[in-house]
Each structure stands twice: as structure tokens, then as C-alpha cells.
């Protein structure tokens, strides 16, 4: 649902994807297609989404892209001699600020879009949610395969960023895979429980057909709930991932660090 309500999927692609020209040229169509897959948009809704996304993309190209380029330049210069926790904190704070600016811009249009949904479109969303939930439950049931898939993806991502590893390094990577991707069912099932609860609340809100201001307030509160001071579980997860980044940073060779910097 996150990628539906704020059109945020597109903006996250922009911040992480190197093919930004493609995104800026076709992002409005992509978001329209994505939303249509959940709601089955009518012509008026489709036109609204594409027109507003063109405006948001132009804003992003003019305002946020230069900031992002400066951000990457800073990371490249700081990363040459390794990273520190304070540098990671600073980088994450800048990323959060970017998120807030993006959300503040998208929320009014997202709220307006939600006020134009019909009962049938909300039912379409519910069916799509049910399909995705079924797929997730299948993954939970095949937990061993899911864990193995994550481990394989982890190694592929490491090689994409840092290049090839020697046999000694591969032993350490295998150790991290075991430590970081356990077969514990609790995190997966807890996320599924939270997902189902959130979906029930969202569908109930949509079916109450509130006005635009109510949707804006709800979206603002929802995005603020991602903040570190509110969501302690998220804070713990972010800290854990930062520590893992520092572990990897100390583990790689200077040549592998340069490889990662070039990948930026």
C-alpha cells in the first residue's frame, strides 16, 4: 500500500536508479500503470495521475536531483578511506530529509486522488491485496527456500558492489549469511500480521469516504510514524543495518572500496 498512496515507488526508484533519464521520461506512465493495476483507473483519474506526476518529476529533476548528486559526491569522497558511524548518521539524516520533502509535495495530490475512488475501485484494491497476501503466505510456508533465496541475493549484491571476493572473504560472507538470514519465522509472521492489520484499517478508512483534509492528515501522520523517535522497531533495524555496513566496510580491500565508489 505504501507504493500506492504516495506514488512513492517512483520517487524511490529515482533516488536509487542510475537510469534517471528513463524514469523522468516515462515515470508518469509507470505510476499510472502501477495504480491502475490496483484500482482500474478511469480516464479522468489516469489523466490526473499522469499530469500531476509530470509536474512532480519536473520538480524532482530541478530541485532534488542536484541535491542527490551532491549527496553521492560526498559519499564518494568520504568513502575513500572508509566510513564511520557519524558519516552514516549524516547520510541517513539527509536521506530522511529528502523523504520528508517528497512526501510533503505528494500528499495533497495523493489525498485528492483517494477522494475520487469509487466503491468498486476499493473492492479492486482489496482483491489485489488478497492476491499479494496469498503470495506472501506461500513464501512464509516455504521459509527455507525464502531464506536460501535471500542468501543468494545477498552474495550477488555484494559482488555487484565490490567485485569478486577471494576464498577467505567468501568464508566470512557465508558466516554473515548464516547470522543475518536465520530461519526464524517470527519476523516474517510478525510483518504479515502487521500487514493484515494495516490493510484492514486502510480499507475501512477508504470505505468511510472522508474528505481531502482527512486524508491529508492521515497521510501526514502515517509518514511521520516512520520517524525514529516514534517507531523504535524501525530505529533498531536501521541501527543494525548501519553496524552491518561498517562491518562490511572494514572487511573489504581498498580496491573493492573503489569498486563500490565507482558503482555510485
Which residue stretches match the model-derived regions?
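C-terminal motif of bacterial Sec signal peptides marking the signal peptidase cleavage site
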Residues: 13-16
Amino acid at each position: 500500500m505504501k507504493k500506492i498512496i504516495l506514488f512513492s515507488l517512483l520517487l524511490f526508484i529515482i533516488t536509487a536508479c542510475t537510469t534517471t533519464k528513463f524514469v523522468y521520461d516515462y515515470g508518469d506512465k509507470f505510476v499510472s500503470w502501477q495504480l491502475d493495476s490496483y484500482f482500474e483507473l478511469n480516464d479522468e483519474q489516469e489523466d490526473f495521475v499522469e499530469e500531476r506526476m509530470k509536474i512532480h518529476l519536473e520538480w524532482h529533476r530541478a530541485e532534488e536531483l542536484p541535491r542527490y548528486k551532491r549527496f553521492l559526491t560526498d559519499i564518494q569522497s568520504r568513502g575513500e578511506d572508509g566510513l564511520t558511524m557519524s558519516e552514516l548518521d549524516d547520510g541517513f539524516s539527509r536521506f530522511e530529509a529528502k523523504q520528508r520533502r517528497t512526501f510533503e509535495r505528494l500528499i495533497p495530490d495523493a489525498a485528492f486522488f483517494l477522494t475520487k475512488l469509487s466503491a468498486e475501485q476499493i473492492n479492486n484494491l482489496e482483491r489485489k491485496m488478497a492476491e499479494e497476501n496469498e503470495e506472501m503466505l506461500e513464501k512464509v510456508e516455504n521459509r527455507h527456500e525464502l531464506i536460501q533465496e535471500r542468501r543468494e541475493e545477498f552474495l550477488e549484491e555484494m559482488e555487484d558492489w565490490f567485485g569478486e571476493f577471494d576464498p577467505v572473504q567468501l568464508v566470512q560472507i557465508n558466516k554473515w549469511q548464516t547470522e543475518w538470514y536465520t530461519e526464524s519465522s517470527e519476523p516474517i509472521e510478525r510483518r504479515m500480521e502487521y500487514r493484515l492489520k494495516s490493510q484492514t484499517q486502510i480499507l475501512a478508512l477508504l470505505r468511510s469516504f472522508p474528505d481531502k483534509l482527512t486524508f491529508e492528515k492521515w497521510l501526514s501522520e502515517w509518514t511521520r510514524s516512520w520517524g525514529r523517535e516514534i517507531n523504535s522497531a524501525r530505529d533498531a533495524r536501521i541501527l543494525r543495518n548501519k553496524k552491518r555496513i561498517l562491518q562490511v566496510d572494514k572487511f573489504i580491500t581498498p580496491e573493492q572500496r573503489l569498486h563500490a565508489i565507482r558503482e555510485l
